[in-house]
């Protein structure tokens, strides 16, 4: 009986650790798969895996860069939003902080509206309705993440690829599909044009 009581006390902690691990696992699978050139529709289940696990631990806090990526990927997969919008909403409702960029993505996903935004990610504020503005902003993308855990991972064995899902999502909302975007470093062009 004592062992069962001990297990019941530890189970929620272990379960939360499991969900956090699974979020990271699915993120890695998605990024590695994309870096290897896998079909973006075949990567969609990994996105769903991120969401289904993240919603279980979102009340503990969602790191800012993870939140931006999760909502940006939602925009990039918006043609399939009926398959994930409930999970994304559950995550959003548990978050204790947000940003104008995340709000921008949410309004687009939930209300099919485009509203002005301001983000703490200054490079995002540089994006207008032109390729040139995106190219300029993208030049700041990597260095703007110098405080991210993955920054400089290309020098370690933990590297999975760097992808600016948020820049691509903003381009999708603004209707910027210029073919020159595929030549920008870190820009996930295949995710941007998958619906075309």
Where are these regions (language model features)?
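Eukaryote-skewed repeat-based solenoidal scaffolds used as protein-protein interaction platforms
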Residues: 1-155, 159
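Alpha-helical oligomerization segments
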Residues: 132-196
